[in-house]
C-alpha cells in the first residue's frame, strides 16, 4: 500500500500535464447534455487497499462530490447518478445498507446547503423505489427536492433503490390504469406518451454513460433513456476515478458519430 502511495505521488505531476492536454482537446465541445454515471467499485477498492468497507463507501462519496463539481464547472446540464440499485437495496446485508444510507444522508444533507447547488441553480430529484428508504432519508429527499424545485439551469438525478425494468413495469401499470379509466386510448400510446409515465417525464435521454471499475454492462440502469447513448467504461475503481478519466470519456464522446439507430 505504501508503494502505491509513493507511485501515485510520483505520477501526479504527469497526470496534471496530461489533464491539461486533454482539456485543450475537448474544451471547445460539443459536450454531452445528459451524463449518466455508474460509480462502481467502492467495495473492491476497499478490499484491494486492505481498508474497512466503510472507508470504501466514504471515499466513493467524496469522489462523487468531486466529479459532480467537475461536471457542473464545464457546463453539462444534466447528471444522473446510479446511487443504489433496486437489487442491492434488497440483497445487501443490513449492515452494508446502513453504511450506504449513512453516506447518502451525509450527501443529501450537503446538497441542501451546497454553494455549488445554488451557484449553478441545480434542481435535485430522486427516482426509484423510495419507499424502501429509512424515514429520515425519505424526509431529506422531500426537503431537497422542494428546496431546489425553483431551479431550472441544471439537473441532478439520484437513482436510489432504482431498477430500469421496474420503472418500465410501473409505467405500464399506470398506463393500463388510465386506459381502464378512459383517460387514454390505445391509439394515443406512443413514445412521447410512454415517457410521461416514467419516474421523471422531463428527463432527457442519456448522451454519455460512464461506468467505473472495468465492468462492461449497464446493470438495469435507465433502460429507456439509454437506447441511443454512447458508453464509456473506465478500468479504475470509483474512488480512484480522476479528472483525466472524465476528460477521456468526453473526448471519446466527441469523436463518435451519433446516428441514433439509423
Swiss-Prot record:
Entry cofactors: Mg(2+)
What SUPFAM superfamilies does this protein map onto?
Answer: Undecaprenyl diphosphate synthase
Looking up InterPro entries in the UniProt record yields:
UPP_synth-like, UPP_synth-like_CS, UPP_synth-like_sf
On cofactor binding, the record's note says: Binds 2 magnesium ions per subunit.
Under the heading PANTHER family, the entry gives: DEHYDRODOLICHYL DIPHOSPHATE SYNTHASE COMPLEX SUBUNIT DHDDS, DEHYDRODOLICHYL DIPHOSPHATE SYNTHASE FAMILY MEMBER
What this chain does, per the entry, is described as: Generates tritrans,heptacis-undecaprenyl diphosphate from isopentenyl pyrophosphate (IPP) and geranylgeranyl diphosphate. It is probably the precursor of glycosyl carrier lipids.
Q: What is this protein called?
A: Tritrans,polycis-undecaprenyl-diphosphate synthase (GGDP specific)
Q: Which organism is it from?
A: Sulfolobus acidocaldarius (strain ATCC 33909 / DSM 639 / JCM 8929 / NBRC 15157 / NCIMB 11770)
Q: What is the lineage of its organism?
A: Archaea, Thermoproteota, Thermoprotei, Sulfolobales, Sulfolobaceae
Amino acid at each position: 500500500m505504501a508503494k502505491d502511495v509513493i507511485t501515485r505521488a510520483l505520477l501526479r505531476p504527469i497526470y496534471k500535464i496530461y489533464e491539461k492536454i486533454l482539456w485543450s482537446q475537448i474544451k471547445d465541445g460539443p459536450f454531452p447534455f445528459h451524463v449518466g454515471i455508474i460509480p462502481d467499485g467502492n467495495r473492491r477498492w476497499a478490499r484491494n487497499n486492505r481498508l474497512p468497507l466503510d472507508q470504501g463507501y466514504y471515499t466513493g462519496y467524496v469522489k462523487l462530490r468531486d466529479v459532480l463539481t467537475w461536471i457542473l464547472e464545464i457546463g453539462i446540464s444534466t447528471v444522473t447518478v446510479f446511487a443504489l440499485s433496486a437489487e442491492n437495496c434488497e440483497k445487501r446485508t443490513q449492515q452494508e445498507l446502513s453504511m450506504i444510507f449513512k453516506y447518502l444522508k451525509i450527501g443529501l444533507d450537503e446538497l441542501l446547503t451546497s454553494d455549488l447547488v445554488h451557484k449553478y441553480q441545480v434542481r435535485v430529484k430522486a427516482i426509484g423505489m423510495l419507499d424502501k428508504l429509512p424515514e429520515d432519508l425519505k424526509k431529506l429527499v422531500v426537503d431537497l427536492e422542494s428546496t431546489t424545485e425553483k431551479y431550472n439551469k441544471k439537473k441532478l438525478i439520484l437513482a436510489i433503490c432504482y431498477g430500469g425494468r421496474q420503472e418500465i413495469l410501473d409505467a405500464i401499470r399506470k398506463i393500463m390504469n388510465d386506459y381502464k379509466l378512459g383517460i387514454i386510448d390505445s391509439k394515443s400510446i406512443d413514445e412521447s406518451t410512454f415517457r410521461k409515465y416514467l419516474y421523471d417525464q422531463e428527463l432527457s435521454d442519456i448522451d454519455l454513460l460512464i461506468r467505473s471499475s472495468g465492468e462492461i454492462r449497464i446493470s438495469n440502469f435507465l433502460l429507456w433513456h439509454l437506447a441511443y447513448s454512447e458508453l464509456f467504461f473506465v478500468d479504475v475503481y470509483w474512488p480512484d476515478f480522476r479528472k483525466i478519466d472524465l476528460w477521456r470519456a468526453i473526448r471519446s464522446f466527441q469523436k463518435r458519430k451519433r446516428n441514433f439507430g439509423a
